[in-house]
Regions:
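Extended N-terminal export/anchoring regions of large proteins
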Residues: 12-174, 204-214
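C-terminal, surface-exposed recognition/capping segments
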Residues: 25-32, 47, 217, 238-254, ...
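Short aromatic-cysteine micro-motif
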Residues: 103-113, 140-284
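A solvent-exposed, charged loop/short amphipathic helix patch at secondary-structure junctions
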Residues: 168-192, 302-327
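Extracellular/surface-associated beta-sandwich interaction domains
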Residues: 199-202, 206, 293, 312, ...
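Extracytoplasmic, non-cytosolic globular domains
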Residues: 272-301, 306
């Protein structure tokens, strides 16, 4: 006889409401299921969708049922002025050209702006249901949904945001006005403190921020949904996650920003190539940790900024009430910093989800990505991983063991550009 599962009426009502809702897309992440594909259950409009599929031999992505999803359709590459207004579209398959075939400014260091792709505003609802995490998306405003990552520091709701197509490079690094840009042909910046990175970002634009915080959470959940999997490397490519080469010091295998063909997505399996997601090599390459000062671990407690307010002490941030325990080396003599592999992620309303203890995953199960932690300092988050971390890298890979003042060859940053209120691409 088959098993019968009985849920309480409140749970069933919530599930039925999700499934019957018009225009709501989403998934349930079953934390107790470790398989990266089996733990994701489609709900709502996409209940019967076929996930995206990557051919890692050719790098080609097939969008399947997601081909007409508004976020994917609207995601185009642009040259964008420093004030956040769009200048002109780039050829989707060759960023060195404008749409009309003439030369672009994608590597022009005199251009007052940079190369960014448009991520249109989407509303999100996220909550825990027992050990499950429910994530729902809507293109229009609804009760209980928030535009997570789409609010500026004044809490204005934006029509979208500009995702950096390239790692942050600092022009005039030795001058009084260093400026971080998103352009091809430049080496990603490294060996800078968080404050130095922040200064360079602010010098680029008053509408510029770090690529971090709630928008990374929203992007990650969209990509989990598209792939129906939490294994981001397997779903989107392995990037340059194993490209470390000590003979190439001081950058040690971190590749120069370059134009990569293949359109919106490009993913390979060699783990030594520039890959891209949403036209961004920052999201797909995993070659350098990206500083996220909007996510802190303050003496073991997560504190977050929901609107790109910058405060590396965390005094101005929301206390999530979620803590990580102190872990010890096997002999109990000292704190163990990692590497850990989370399988459970706890929702922070209006922000996203953070990894929590216990850690029962691996590079191919649970969240599939690594976690490093230090619960005795004020740690500023680093995301995605570096070219020395291999399979521990990924969209959910997280380091919360470094202070704001720590600088390294494998620490960098990228510019998120906020458009003026009411401006859309």
């Amino acid at each position: 006889m088959g098993k019968t599962y009985i849920a309480d009426k409140e749970t069933l009502d919530k599930c039925y409401a999700i499934l019957s809702a018009d225009g709501i897309y989403g998934f349930i992440e079953h934390m107790d299921v470790l398989s990266p594909t089996a733990r994701i259950e489609y709900i709502g409009q996409n209940k019967d969708f076929t996930p995206i599929s990557l051919n890692k031999d050719t790098g080609t992505m097939t969008l399947n049922s997601w081909a007409d999803f508004p976020i994917i359709v609207a995601n185009k590459p642009w040259m964008v002025r420093a004030d956040g207004t769009p200048d002109y579209r780039l050829d989707e398959n060759d960023y060195t050209k404008k749409e009309d075939g003439t030369a672009s400014d994608v590597s022009n260091t005199s251009y007052n702006g940079g190369a960014f792709s448009w991520l249109a505003k989407i509303y999100k609802q996220e909550y825990m249901l027992g050990n499950d995490r429910v994530v729902k998306f809507s293109m229009r405003e609804r009760d209980g949904f928030e535009p997570v990552g789409f609010k500026d520091p004044s809490n204005n709701v934006l029509e979208g945001v500009w995702i950096p197509m390239f790692y942050g490079s600092i022009l005039g690094a030795d001058t009084s006005t260093p400026k971080m840009v998103s352009l091809a042909g430049l080496q990603p910046c490294y060996n800078n403190t968080t404050d130095k990175e922040h200064t360079a970002i602010a010098n680029f634009s008053s509408r510029a921020a770090f690529l971090g915080g709630g928008i990374v959470q929203t992007i990650t959940d969209l990509l989990i949904m598209f792939a129906k999997s939490t294994n981001s490397q397997e779903a989107y490519g392995y990037g340059n996650s194993s490209g470390y080469d000590a003979s190439l010091a001081p950058t040690n295998g971190v590749k120069q920003n370059a134009v990569v063909g293949g359109g919106q997505f490009y993913g390979t399996k060699d783990a030594k190539s520039l890959n891209k997601i949403f036209h961004s090599i920052v999201l797909g390459t995993y070659q350098q940790w990206m500083r996220d000062p909007y996510t802190l671990l303050v003496n073991g407690r997560y504190k977050v900024s929901k609107n790109y307010t910058y405060d590396v002490t965390g005094a101005k941030y929301q206390d999530t009430g979620i803590s990580l325990p102190k872990m010890f080396e096997s002999d109990g003599s000292a704190q163990k910093y990692g590497i850990f592999y989370p399988h459970k992620y706890q929702t922070v309303p209006g922000f996203g989800a953070v990894p929590v203890h216990p850690y029962k995953g691996s590079t191919s199960t649970g969240g599939c990505d690594g976690l490093w932690q230090n619960v005795e300092i004020v740690a500023v988050a680093l995301r995605f991983g570096a070219c020395s971390n291999g399979l521990a890298d990924g969209l959910r890979s997280l380091t919360v063991y470094a202070t704001a003042g720590l600088a390294s060859w494998d620490f960098g940053a990228a510019v998120l550009l906020l458009p003026p209120v009411g401006v859309a691409a």
